[in-house]
Regions:
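A cross-kingdom C-terminal cell-surface attachment/processing module
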Residues: 503-526
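Substrate-binding/active-site clefts of carbohydrate-active enzymes
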Residues: 1-174, 194-210, 217-220, 243
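Solvent-exposed loop/turn segments at secondary-structure junctions
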Residues: 1-4, 54-57, 117-122, 184-187, ...
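Active-site-proximal helices and loops of the catalytic beta/alpha 8
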Residues: 165-179, 183-272, 286-289, 295-297, ...
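Short strand-edge motifs at loop-to-beta-strand transitions and within beta-strands
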Residues: 438-440
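Conserved, mostly hydrophobic/aromatic
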Residues: 40, 50, 84, 104, ...
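C-terminal low-complexity, Ser/Thr- and acidic/Pro-rich disordered "stalk" regions positioned immediately N-terminal
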Residues: 460-501
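Cytoplasmic C-terminal tails of single-pass
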Residues: 528-530
């Protein structure tokens, strides 16, 4: 639901599949992503996660137990495949798909395609008859037809080989950069290892981030560090961010410290605040904790700082960067809103906050992606937290304030008295005192609640006092099927090919094409969407 550029294809899956109903197609397409690449690059993202691209079942059907109050469903989300070798015509043509990828690559950005290996769409039993398991046999997460969706017998070597061939063809033929892998816990580990091996044969730097529902750094079904997934989506982080902005700073820092120690380039998680499967961060605060909209907006700003300065792969859900948020109130899912680009303005504090933070993260990729994390000043009662992030001789001090008033804090630093430091977030400068502390003002949460301090290193040219960032790489965002400033670091470069990419990349969840969502509670009961 990101951007509708080619309106002529909106009803390509049937005249009754497009409309205002939240469970129909809303128009997002490949051409729409291409049209908004400059917006995404300006925001500071480097990887665009789009929903499944393959042809899905046409028309509409009541699939949710025939309940009268459930809207009709079209395969707008992309998870009801009918042909894994063809593009979904409601998303665009082959040429539009190629153009989207090539134009993204010109900007040093990557395209991450959502894929489904577990199942096909409703009504495709005859199409895939020789590939499906017996519906009458149900054995746990793997050997069962989740939500009645035709389930592939992936433990069969021939079936596995065909599925792997279908998925890797998008790499070989079109240059897709990454996969987001759906329903990881519902497929056997042998299949995931086979897919990983095949993608590596095509492109050694290819990465896969898995959706293993409920996964975190400590529990992920052994999918990480085992030759299956390069990363998993981090389902723990949202709860931790909520706890942080609620005042439980010390307990969250214990979690983040352990997480920071566990993550490495072959064992990575992608932290998100909102998604198509979850309530939006702001909406959840307003609904569950009864925050006002202003209070929720302020808290979301600090949560974004926590997310974008933490180790791992930040995943930004489309519209989150301009303040949009909704509930995963199945079957209506207000979290599956249409993108509103009119909110991306200089006056939008949330939008400017994201651009600022992404620019800083991009300029100090190694520090944030690999660096140590140490608490240097913190108080649950007073609502502030300052941590040092250090790597390769560079140290940044990240300060966050969850209160509605600015906070004066003396930050202990490992710098000599008299050293000048700069707040990368605001541009303010400070001097290290004789006690080796820096007295800083962390703004109120409503004003961003953030400071990021760095040493101002003297150079031969007195006009150049800012430290040179050790690496610059873009960041990322994900799109959804409807649709739906200027990045401070304008450096453009080809997509990195290093194996370390798994640590440096930032995926942003803007469900740009087809919409992919379902509530967490519903997820356990049914898999109608993903």
């Amino acid at each position: 639901r990101f951007f509708d550029d080619n309106q002529s294809i909106n009803t390509a899956s049937g005249a009754d599949t497009y409309g205002d109903n939240p469970r129909l197609y809303h128009g997002g397409d490949f051409a729409g992503v291409t049209a908004k690449l400059d917006y995404l690059q300006d925001l500071g993202v480097n990887t665009i996660w789009i929903t499944p691209i393959v042809e899905n079942v046409k028309g509409v059907a009541v699939t949710d137990e025939g309940k009268e109050d459930v809207p009709y469903n079209a395969a707008y989300h992309g998870y009801w495949a009918s042909d894994f070798t063809k593009l979904n015509p409601t998303m665009g043509t082959t040429e539009e798909f190629k153009t989207m990828i090539s134009e993204a690559h010109k900007r040093g950005m990557r395209i991450m395609v959502d894929i489904v290996v577990n199942h096909a769409g409703y009504g495709t039993e005859s199409t895939f008859a020789d590939m499906l398991r017996d519906k009458s046999v149900s054995e746990g997460d793997i050997k069962s037809w989740q939500s009645g969706l035709p389930d592939f017998a992936t433990e069969n070597a021939d079936v596995r080989a065909k599925l792997v061939e279908w998925q890797t063809s998008w790499m070989r033929n079109y240059g897709v950069d990454y996969f987001r892998v759906d329903t990881v816990k519902h497929v056997d580990s042998t299949t995931w290892a086979a897919l990983k091996n095949s993608t590596t044969e095509v492109n050694p730097s290819f990465k896969m981030i898995g959706e293993y529902y409920g996964a975190g750094y400590a529990s992920n079904g052994s999918t990480l560090g085992s030759g299956q997934m390069d990363a998993d989506l981090d389902f723990d982080f949202n709860d931790q961010a909520t706890s942080f902005v609620s005042g439980n700073i010390s307990s969250v820092e214990k979690f983040l410290s352990a997480r920071n120690s566990a993550l490495n380039n072959t064992y990575m998680t992608g932290q998100f605040l909102s998604s198509h499967d979850e309530d939006g961060f702001k909406a959840a605060l307003m609904n569950g904790k009864k925050y006002t909209e202003d209070e929720a907006t302020s808290a979301a700003l600090v949560a974004a700082t926590l997310q974008l300065t933490a180790k791992g792969i930040p995943v930004i859900y489309y519209g989150e960067e301009v303040g949009l948020s909704g509930l995963n109130n199945y079957p209506y899912q207000t979290n599956r809103y249409d993108m509103d680009f009119s909110k991306a303005t200089k006056d939008n504090v949330t939008y400017q906050h994201y651009k600022n933070l992404l620019s800083i993260r991009n300029a100090y990729t190694d520090v944030f992606a690999r660096g140590s994390r140490t608490v240097v000043a913190s108080s649950d009662e007073e609502g502030y937290d300052v941590v040092s992030r250090s790597y390769g001789g560079t140290t940044l001090y990240v300060g966050m304030n969850i209160k509605d008033t600015a906070k004066e804090v003396k930050v202990p630093v490992s710098l000599a008295a008299g050293t000048e430091v700069k707040d990368l977030y605001s541009g303010a400068t400070y001097t290290v005192g004789s006690d080796k502390t820096v007295a800083v003002t962390i703004p109120a949460a409503k004003d961003g609640g953030t400071v990021i301090l760095t040493e101002v290193k003297k150079t031969k040219d007195p006009g150049k006092t800012d430290p040179t960032p050790e690496k610059v790489s873009a960041t990322s965002i994900t799109l959804d099927k409807k649709t739906a400033g200027k990045q401070q670091n304008d450096t453009k470069k080809a997509a990195p090919k290093s194996g370390d990419d798994n640590e440096a990349a930032t995926y942003v969840c803007l469900l740009g094409l087809a919409m992919v969502a379902i509530t967490a509670a519903t997820y356990r009961k049914k898999r109608a969407c993903n």
